[in-house]
Amino acid sequence: MKARTILAAMAAVLMTSAAANAAQVAALVGNDTIAWVDTVQKKATGMTKVTGISGALVGIDVRPADGMLYGLVEDGTVVTIAQDGKATMKSKLDTMVAKGLTVTVDFNPAADRLRVIGSDGMNLRANVDDGKVTKDGDLKFAETDMHKGEKPNVVGGAYINSVKGAKETALYDIDGTIGGLLKQAPPNDGILSAVGKLGIKADKVAFDIWSDGNGKNDAWLMAGDTLYSVDLATGKATEAAKISGVSGIVRDIAILPGM
């Protein structure tokens, strides 16, 4: 076997192994449909319409505190979503991002609060148990960042160490205009620093981070039917798999636990 062939085979094995870490993924397709994606088989094993909601879902995430899949509706209603698609209301946020914007949602595993970010820069922190929302600092690039003065366009975001009982975490975002990975630190202040370019178009992408609970974090991005791994140190996105059975705009993804 030629050296080039060996290297290609090794790369394929490594990418297959990496995709396996993502395990089962819930992908929000359109306004109200969940595609259940098996990253090992590289296909959607089912498409489920979410019932019991009034309006469009704008984001989904797994809450580390209870392992359940949550969804946020455009009017601020927070629901849990069962495997059969049935939505059960948890609360209604007292403050919500304006309709028509791209919304990013992800649970802070250390604080057990839902981060809600609008593509206009609004930066919210919500208690999903009672719906109370704290409006944090609007997003802006750090004074020392190369993008200082530019308007952020965050279209995805996720925390590392996303497991129950996490003591430390950090928030990473995707900017659709720059096409790059950002770090939001501190998250409550909304200060953004560029990590690096993804190398792909990023205006319509979904983003989440898988954590093993021992410090390992693998970032994943889905654009249409393509799943990418994202290097949190450089921002580079690398194609991991083409997922069959997924059609339409994937608005968000949530990596499911224990699958």
Where are these regions (language model features)?
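Loop/turn residues immediately N-terminal
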Residues: N31-A35, G67, E74-V79, D120-N123, ...
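A short beta-strand motif characteristic of beta-propeller blades
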Residues: K43-G52, G85-M96, K135-H147, G190-G199, ...
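An edge-strand/N-cap motif at the start of beta-rich repeat modules
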Residues: A22-V40
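Blade-level signature of beta-propeller repeat domains, shared across WD40, Kelch, NHL, RCC1
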Residues: L232, A237-M259
